[in-house]
């Protein structure tokens, strides 16, 4: 199975998450490709069995680079996806990601969110247990 992972990360939390996830998927003999929103072309994504999108919530919304990337996706009709959202609030933004991708007629497989604690700018604010939560998520893909 081939996974293409598209992410955006300001302080490193989403980068840490997608790198960990890619290793877990490789343990299942999967092929993975990781791209930032700056590296990927939303009009011509590499072929994949499943696309995984990972980004933070910022200013009570989905991070703007990922939001714009999702709006610009082309030729995604019927493609499968999973979503990951990091956030410092009590409410995640998975539903905003879902709404954007449903407009592209994509099919959701799974979603997971990770609340971050204080000291966000350190890049080490993922709360204890994030790896176990991500292991469970990977098992559903």
PLM segments and residue spans:
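FMN-binding flavodoxin-like domain, especially the glycine-rich phosphate-binding loop
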Residues: 16, 24, 28, 33, ...
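Conserved SAM/SAH-binding loop
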Residues: 37-40
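N-terminal beta1-alpha1 ligand-phosphate binding loop
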Residues: 2-24
């Amino acid at each position: 199975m081939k996974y293409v992972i598209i992410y955006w990360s300001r302080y490193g939390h989403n980068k840490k998450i997608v790198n960990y996830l890619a290793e877990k998927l490789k343990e299942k003999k999967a092929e993975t490709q990781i791209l930032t929103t700056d590296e990927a072309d939303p009009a011509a994504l590499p072929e994949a069995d499943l696309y995984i999108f990972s980004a933070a919530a910022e200013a009570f919304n989905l991070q703007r680079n990922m939001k714009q990337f999702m709006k610009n996706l082309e030729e995604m009709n019927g493609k499968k996806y999973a979503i990951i959202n990091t956030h410092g609030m009590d409410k995640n933004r998975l539903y905003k990601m879902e709404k954007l991708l449903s407009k592209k007629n994509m099919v959701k497989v799974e979603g997971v969110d990770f609340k971050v604690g204080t000291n966000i700018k350190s890049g080490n604010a993922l709360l204890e247990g994030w790896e176990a939560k991500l292991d469970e998520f990977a098992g559903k893909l």
